[in-house]
A protein has these predicted regions:
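N-terminal ligand-binding/catalytic initiation module
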Residues: 1-163, 397, 424-442
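Terminal amphipathic helices with adjacent charged low-complexity linkers/tails
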Residues: 151, 159, 225-228, 387-417
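Solvent-exposed alpha-helices and their adjacent loops that cap or buttress functional pockets
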Residues: 62-68, 104-105, 130-132, 156-157, ...
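Glycine-rich phosphate/diphosphate-binding loop of Rossmann-like nucleotide-binding domains
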Residues: 82, 89-107, 165, 173-272, ...
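General beta-strand structural signal in soluble alpha/beta enzymes
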Residues: 113, 139-142, 163-166, 223, ...
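Rossmann-like adenosine-cofactor binding region
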Residues: 247-320, 325-327
């Protein structure tokens, strides 16, 4: 049987070969007919001046007269790329191209990679703010913590388009979706559930705030990391007030029983553990799981290797186990979230996205599983109906929250999203059939 290390090595070799062959995963093509050079006179100068004049009178006309309505900027500084760490903007580009490809294939969204060479959070905010006119929304990606919290917060406050950090919000959203169905299976209520968030990086900090918005009891939520259980008396609490105020606020609001000491103490009597910690089996010990309540729910989300293998977790008493991997049941995958969420905010021409809309998104995703069981708590990526349904739920939520520039019924938004996604897939199929996209070479 092939080892995980060998499988990863083989995939890396194939990725390098294919990347050299295709030289990029996305491209830009005209979407208008060009029958002769005379057509340039209205697609470009002099006719285009009338279009610019119209937008100058009302900048929202850019959504009607240009591609802004369907354009997303994927912005990164390359400081926390996958499991690679700080590799810089150039080395982040293949990852951002892959993200853009998924945006387009699953959501019909035109996403543009925008790696930027910046060194501090204030410069990042300035550069992103300056680029706002080109895009209908932003997806922030692979930014180190705690810089990512500052950048997201500042851009959400200052910009007039939705700003999303997928490492935070996408992970939190699909985690909540999985927990909704897991709690149904074990017959527990969210307001009664005791939750441990193991790891206090971008994903779990955002998950804590989303669980609060969803109605979980923050006093029954405990955060633990490499320094032990987070509480107001921990030795680093004063410094957190200045270096990571988002984590500091959680230290004050969570852990009603004031558990302290080693992380293992947080597991005792817990109903749920969501781990986004070190990618190393054994990071979570089997005996920690055995101290949890009956019908325990364990999400071990580190990639490429979970913090505890699913079999070990189940043998130790867990009833439901989820990971970030596709070769185990219950993959908690951001790709179930961001294509549909962005399709929705773009269709509504939204000005912002918030935790309430994320709760709506999580409920829409969980609702795709009509009869959840221990091995099926979230949909799979080949559930094609997921994305337009999620988009319509998000778009209509933007309308009800007063964030939308465009107001339609939920059914109309479903029709809009379905048409865009289906049209995009037909265009992609036509490129394949015509040979415009070359067949995949032998691996």
């Amino acid at each position: 049987m092939i080892s995980d290390e060998q499988r990863t090595s083989d995939l890396g070799r194939i990725a390098l070969k294919f990347s050299e062959y295709y030289r990029g995963k996305i491209r830009v093509l005209p979407k208008v007919p060009i029958n002769s050079l005379k057509d340039f006179s209205y697609w470009y100068t002099p006719g285009v001046a009338a279009v610019s004049t119209s937008i100058n009178k009302n900048t929202d006309e850019a959504y009607n007269l240009t591609g802004k309505w369907n354009s997303v900027g994927i912005i990164t500084d390359g400081t926390r790329v996958l499991g690679l760490g700080n590799v810089g903007p150039e080395a982040s580009l293949p990852v951002m191209e892959g993200k853009a490809m998924i945006f387009n294939y699953l959501g019909g969204v035109n996403a543009i990679p925008v790696p930027i060479r910046v060194t501090d959070k204030d410069t990042f905010v300035k550069v992103a703010s300056a680029l706002e006119p080109s895009f209908g929304a932003y997806n922030l990606e692979d930014i180190e913590s705690p810089k990512c919290f500052f950048v997201l917060e500042e851009l959400q406050k200052s910009m007039n388009i939705p700003v999303w950090h997928d490492d935070q919000l996408g992970t939190a959203c699909i985690t909540l979706a999985g927990l909704i169905n897991s709690l149904k299976i074990v017959g527990k209520k969210k307001e009664d559930a005791s939750v441990v968030l193991f790891g206090s990086g971008a994903a779990n900090i955002a998950t804590a705030y989303l669980l609060e918005a969803a109605g979980f009891d923050m006093k029954k939520l405990v955060i633990a990391d490499s320094k032990g259980v987070l509480n107001p008396d921990r030795s680093d609490i004063d410094s957190l007030m200045f270096t990571n105020p988002w984590k500091y606020r959680l230290a004050m609001a969570t852990n009603g029983e004031r558990i302290s000491g080693e992380s293992s103490k947080a597991f005792k009597g817990a109903d749920i553990v969501v781990s986004a910690a070190k990618s190393e089996p054994g990071t979570i010990h089997r005996d920690w799981i055995s101290t949890m309540n009956k019908d325990a729910i364990v999400f071990a989300l580190a990639n490429p290797s979970p913090e505890i293998w699913p079999g070990d977790a189940k043998e130790s008493g867990a009833r439901i186990v989820a990971t970030g991997r596709s070769d185990f049941p219950n993959q908690i995958n951001n790709s179930l979230v961001f294509p549909g969420v962005f399709r929705g905010v773009l269709d509504a021409r939204a000005r912002k996205v918030d935790f309430d809309i994320m709760v709506t998104a999580a409920e829409s995703i969980s609702g795709r599983i009509k009869e959840p069981d221990e091995d099926h708590i979230v949909p799979s990526m080949d559930d094609w109906h997921l994305y337009p349904e999620l988009a319509s739920a998000v778009a209509y939520s933007c309308v009800t929250k007063g964030y939308a520039r465009r107001s339609e019924s939920k059914n109309k938004f479903l029709e809009i999203a379905t048409d865009i996604i289906e049209e995009n897939r037909k265009a992609y199929a036509a490129l394949l059939d015509s040979g415009s996209i070359k067949p995949t070479p032998e691996a």
